């Protein structure tokens, strides 16, 4: 997963795993989108390893009935967090069956609605706990073979872990029966329901690859899933261990919590990565795609036993994703990425004093410093030894949990390498070893130029201008040329116009995007060249360019609006939202202001994803188009499951409440709000 979480492992549960081994879970589930509830029947097969009088299954706020042990009623109780089976359990194989109901406040999400024909239902177990929607185990050390049968409206597709063994339609419902062969931790359990189509490919090793998409996004399929098959084939070969889960599926879902999630055999990812050919430049799914796939080995096959060793998942997935991108985009890309992350880590270590081997480490540390540590190790012991150690490590600990020492044992078997010193420097020290990092980075010619350029940051322009021009005229990797632009930020246009002409002439959309952000207002002398960025193959560049030109040249606003009136942009409508806001704030623009205002407000409503809504609300508030409907949509934002959007709503309401006019409007909204909205707004109204 692309954002960090913490495993919370209790001592009590650690004791249980020594006494009981849960082996197989069979569940039949019924999901009710109207009530946002889930119900089902679950059977667990387990082995009592030594006598125990209470067995616990994590179950958050669930109601249970028909609880039976080996087909006979058994005493049980619940405490709001667990189902407790009370019985003098003796050694041997047993099974427990029960029915349950729940209305989860998290981990099971209902997006859209059947009425609007845009319903999606999906789960997210990591960092949230699967035990909110399926009675299971919050402790990652308990690994189970999960088999789900999900019953839902026949007009929808249902995706879950494992292989679809049977699909039976009975009346208005379809029974989807998924089966797994190997055990996994509960946080990797998933289901996704929606109206999806799919295309299937086959890997070089014969694994079925299923890529899902919404029918409306059929034209976006190729750029969205670009390189997916190649990434799979590369990682399977590079890792040296056959993909362990039978088949592999990917499905984009709306308003997802993260960039992606590596559920076993079934990755869910954010619909923001559903892009067309232009959108691919700014929002390519490639890195997330490779990262989540790498987790199928590093995280799903072998799982860190506790959060202290979380780098064994995120650091490894980050590094192997980078190796996959190196295969696709070349060594310059690879070293440029490592250089960029080295700069971030060096800067972060000024205030972040928590090392990799610590449960409280930051995402940057777990992911990027973990990846850097692997890069150093890979370079030090050589490719052959590194691959052998990885292969042995995965095979030895397959379907188990691991710690860092387990990995080091395999390193020491293949190389005379001091893992203790390596650990002290790269995993136990919060500081970033810049000297060692730079020595490795200098193997790349582009980074040599980059490091030389870095030495000139505080050098007056006149003294370095010739060197900067040579860099821009060379065939060095484009990120180095972007660093030239970075050094021009505080210079006047007249002093840098020759450099800008060279940079613009590269026709590299990314370099030109850095130029688009260079000036608070576009210089008159740069206007004609700057206008060419309106046609660059980047929706992000176009967004910057349109606003900057509109803001800089008042007399040309209508011309710019006419030129861009059919723009849409990404699937969050970034260009359309900006265009509407600018059109509404351009006097004498020949357009139906009421219709434009209605459209912009609509983008802030429940009909759209959080990213679109936030874009629209920012424009509406920023340009003072603040109607009661806008404020209602802002209040609704505070109830959203995406914490960033919810915080955006709260922060903006707090600002608006300082104006008595808006405070009155908010108070007048209270009678028409639902209970959740009302609760959130009342809390803000009484804040001091």
Predicted stretch roles:
Residues 14-242:
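Acidic/His-enriched low-complexity segments
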């Amino acid at each position: 997963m692309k954002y960090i979480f913490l495993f919370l492992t209790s001592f009590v549960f650690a004791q249980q795993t020594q006494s009981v081994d849960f082996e197989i879970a069979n569940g039949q589930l019924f999901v009710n989108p109207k009530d946002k509830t889930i119900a089902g029947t679950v059977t667990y097969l387990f082995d009592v390893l030594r006598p125990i009088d209470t067995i616990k299954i994590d179950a958050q706020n669930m109601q249970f009935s028909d609880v039976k042990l080996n087909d006979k009623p058994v005493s049980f109780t619940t405490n709001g967090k667990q189902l407790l089976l009370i019985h003098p359990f003796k050694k041997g194989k047993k099974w427990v069956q029960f029915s349950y109901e729940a209305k989860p406040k998290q981990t099971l999400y209902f997006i859209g609605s059947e009425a609007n024909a845009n319903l999606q239902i999906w789960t997210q177990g990591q960092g949230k706990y699967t035990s909110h929607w399926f009675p299971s185990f919050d402790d990652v050390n308990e690994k189970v073979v999960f088999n789900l049968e999900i019953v839902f409206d026949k007009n929808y597709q249902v995706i879950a872990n494992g292989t679809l063994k049977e699909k039976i339609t009975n009346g208005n419902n379809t029974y989807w029966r998924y089966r797994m062969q190997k055990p996994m931790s509960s946080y990797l359990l998933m289901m996704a329901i929606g109206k999806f189509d799919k295309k299937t490919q086959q890997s070089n090793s014969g694994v079925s690859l299923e890529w899902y998409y919404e029918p409306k996004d059929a034209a976006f399929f190729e750029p969205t899933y670009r390189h997916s098959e190649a990434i799979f084939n590369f990682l399977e070969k590079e890792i040296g261990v056959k993909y362990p889960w039978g088949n592999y599926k990917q499905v984009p879902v709306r308003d997802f919590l993260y960039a992606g999630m590596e559920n076993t055999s079934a990755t869910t990812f954010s619909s923001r990565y559903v892009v067309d050919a232009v959108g691919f430049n700014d929002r390519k799914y490639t890195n997330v795609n490779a990262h989540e796939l790498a987790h199928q080995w590093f995280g799903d096959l072998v799982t860190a036993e506790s959060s202290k060793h979380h780098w064994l998942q995120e650091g490894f997935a980050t590094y192997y994703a980078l190796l996959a991108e190196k295969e696709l985009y070349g060594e310059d890309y690879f070293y440029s990425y490592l250089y960029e992350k080295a700069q971030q880590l060096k800067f972060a270590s000024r205030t972040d004093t928590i090392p990799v081997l610590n449960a409280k480490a930051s995402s940057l540390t777990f992911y990027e410093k973990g990846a850097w540590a692997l890069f150093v190790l890979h370079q030090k012991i050589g490719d052959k030894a590194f691959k052998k150690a990885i292969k042995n490590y995965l095979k030895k600990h397959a379907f188990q949990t691991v710690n860092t020492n387990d990995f080091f044992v395999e390193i020491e078997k293949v190389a005379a390498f001091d893992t203790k010193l390596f650990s002290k420097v790269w995993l136990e020290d919060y500081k970033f070893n810049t000297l060692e990092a730079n020595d490795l980075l200098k193997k790349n010619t582009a980074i040599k130029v980059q490091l030389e350029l870095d030495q000139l940051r505080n050098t007056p322009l006149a003294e370095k201008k010739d060197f900067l021009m040579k860099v821009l005229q060379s065939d060095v990797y484009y990120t180095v040329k972007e660093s030239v632009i970075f050094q021009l930020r505080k210079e006047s246009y007249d002093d840098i116009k020759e450099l800008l002409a060279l940079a613009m002439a590269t026709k590299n959309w990314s370099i030109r995007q850095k130029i688009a952000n260079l000036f608070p207002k576009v210089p008159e002398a740069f206007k004609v060249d700057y206008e060419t960025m309106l046609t660059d193959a980047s929706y992000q560049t176009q967004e910057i360019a349109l606003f900057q030109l509109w803001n800089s040249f008042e007399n040309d606003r209508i011309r710019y609006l006419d030129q861009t009136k059919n723009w849409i942009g990404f699937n969050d409508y970034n260009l359309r939202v900006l265009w509407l806001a600018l059109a509404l704030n351009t006097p004498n623009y020949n357009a139906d202001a009421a219709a434009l205002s209605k459209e912009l407000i609509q983008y802030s409503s429940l009909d759209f994803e959080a990213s679109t809504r936030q874009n629209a609300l920012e424009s509406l508030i920023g340009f003072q188009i603040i109607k009661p409907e806008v404020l209602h949509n802002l209040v609704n934002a505070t109830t959203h499951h995406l914490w960033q959007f919810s915080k955006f709503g709260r922060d903006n309401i707090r600002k608006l409440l300082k104006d008595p006019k808006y405070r009155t409007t908010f108070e007048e909204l209270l009678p028409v709000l639902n209970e959740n909205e009302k609760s959130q707004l009342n809390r803000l109204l009484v804040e001091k």
